[in-house]
């Protein structure tokens, strides 16, 4: 299973952007990482979309992500 497949299986919309120098950034839409009492944005970067997805997975590993934090549909998920 590729990193993109793993992220897609969460059911959370995935945003993929081309950034400076032809590199790519990947992140979940409307999703933040819980850091104590703060919510921080996180994204993966890489030379390819797959590398960016793998970087994002590494950054989320073992952390609580918060989906739609300011809505009634807010969800907190431990990313394993």
Locate predicted features:
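Short N-terminal "domain-start" leader segments
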Residues: 1-25
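Short, charged, surface-exposed hinge/linker loops at domain edges
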Residues: 2-5, 60-80
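Assembly/interface hotspot detector across virion components, adhesins/toxins, and nucleic-acid enzymes
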Residues: 17, 31, 65-67
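A short, exposed loop/beta-hairpin motif centered on an aromatic-Gly-Thr core
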Residues: 31-51
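Short acidic, gly/pro-rich beta-turn/loop elements at beta-sheet edges
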Residues: 36, 54, 68
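A short, charged, amphipathic alpha-helix used as a generic interaction element across diverse proteins
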Residues: 45-63
